[in-house]
Amino acid sequence: MQFTRGLLALVILIAPALAPAEECEVELFVLGAGQDAGAPHIGYPDDPAWADPALGQTATSIAVVDHVAGERFLFEATPHVTRQLQLLDTLAPADGPGLGLDGVFLTHAHIGHYAGLMYFGREGAGADGIPVFVMPRFAAFLQGNGPWSQLVKLENIVIQPLAAETPVQASKGIHVTPLTVPHRDEFSETVGFVIVTNASKTLFLPDLDSWDEWAQASGIDLATRVVELDHLFVDATFFQDGELTGRDMSEIPHPRVKDTMERLSGLSPELRQKVRFIHYNHTNPIRFPASPESALVSARGFDVARAGDRLCLAP
């Protein structure tokens, strides 16, 4: 399988559509890799992306495309969904009119993961019956609260309830299984998704509180999951403690990138290279490819997901 590093965002957006790097039946595309609010970040005037937009980042989202069936599935509807669908159209154009989405899978009800649904309504795309796959509490939240309830009423979206650890067939070549994980669940459950093809299993897990809490709840630790899966896109919100000035980061539960790397340091290089860090905060230095922290991630045998990356899930 081949993991191809994406081009610079500006080049991607103006270039003609790119063919897959190899013959590939099911392909994953990284559309964004930042934390919910992206970068430059609101209330952060010193962010270098204000002066250089090329340093900006959009919130975390991936797409999985079944090239055989001509179907495209979006994972997370972010506040940057307009730009991200334009990127997807450049990398893997839709076969027909409209948004060309055959389903949207949402992990939880925090702004960076579902707020982009607002663009599917009559003020935006005026979408027609896009299936939106969510857990039961999340479904009730969307159905019972505006403006999301209007999307349901007008059938811009059609809610497809999920059940934990129960796979759904997205297309002939793709099955998706939600796994509940510990996180702030004010309005919905939080899940990661295992995306299964005939050749691979991929974990998409942008948000959780603690590897230990998840292992205790599920009975499976992170190292075991790395062994059992082929690719893992995991929470990299913070690189280490001390990133947020004036904040007690012990009160902000997310696995730190340094801790995750240390936990997996005993695994072989072949296993460590399965892990790709995603959902990094604007304060996390791995957002910059040339940073010492990004170099450290590579030196330890891991990778950092970047917008424009593509990964073949079924050759």
Task: Name the predicted role of every residue range.
Residues 74-78, 100-113, 117, 133-135, ...:
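Active-site neighborhood of phospho(di)ester-bond hydrolases with catalytic His/Asp-centered motifs
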Residues 80-126:
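Di-metal (Zn2+ and/or Mg2+/Mn2+) metal-binding site signature of metallo-dependent hydrolases
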Residues 8-9, 19:
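Cleavable N-terminal signal peptides
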Residues 137-146:
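A short, active-site helix/loop in glycosyltransferases that binds the activated sugar's phosphate group
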Residues 1-7:
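Bacterial N-terminal signal peptides that target proteins for export
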Residues 14-16, 20:
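N-terminal signal peptide c-region/cleavage motif recognized by signal peptidases
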Residues 22-90, 94-96, 159-225, 309-315:
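Core dinuclear metal-dependent hydrolase active-site scaffold
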Residues 199-201, 209-310:
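Cap/insert and terminal regions of metallo-dependent hydrolase folds
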